[in-house]
């Protein structure tokens, strides 16, 4: 099953007062973190839908940006544009907003997993988390074949995400159902992934929390300079993990997260429980 990521960045952020996509997050931005989490969940491509003439913070080269020509119609308009852009390249898209500062890759994987079920996965149109009794349509997975359905809803001025579910086959996952997944239960037992920030006070409270605790190790010649470890550190990005062991993430250093080589992307987001390894690019470790 080909799965993509779709980030809706074009909201007006009226309650926040400033665009959420560009809000600072531990040396990065909320939008950059969201795109990185989707990449780490194995989604490709990752597409960002923005409003007309909206300026976005810097993003990796492999993140695609799609312009929504119509502003002010809410998330369904952005979904219609994004699902259409993905329809020929992915069967399913995890659709989310930019205001999920604690989104974890394991939540994304959990929501996508039912589509791969050999018996009834093909029949599903939507997998919808229902956290603490509230549906989460902007942290959900949708068949890209729903693009014309969503576009028709927008054309009919039926702009609430709930209208998608009226004629779709929807699997709703409440807290207990989500946490039957052992990996998600270990990584995010309280489902912080589904906490969003709508107002400035929400953002300030989220930003005041400590960065995730990760394990950092150095190998080869870097171990002699920074200590082999492993050592615990608070770091929200690979760059912050490097600084925690007094390393400069330059062309001489390579990073791997949980065994997957990531190169030198200092803004790649980290999540609680990650292990970050640094090795010398010159000596291969």
Regions found by a protein language model. Give the residues of each.
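Short, conserved phosphate/pyrophosphate- and ester-handling motifs at nucleotide-, phospho-/glycolipid
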Residues: 143, 199
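Acidic phosphotransfer microenvironment of two-component signaling modules
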Residues: 29, 201, 260
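An accessory alpha-helical subdomain
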Residues: 160-162
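Nucleotide and nucleotide-moiety/phosphate-recognizing core
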Residues: 1-138, 144-158, 167-191, 272, ...
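The catalytic Nudix box helix
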Residues: 31, 198, 241
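Ubiquitin-like/PB1-type beta-grasp interaction modules and other compact soluble beta-rich domains
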Residues: 204-284
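Conserved anion/nucleotide-ligand pocket segment
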Residues: 195
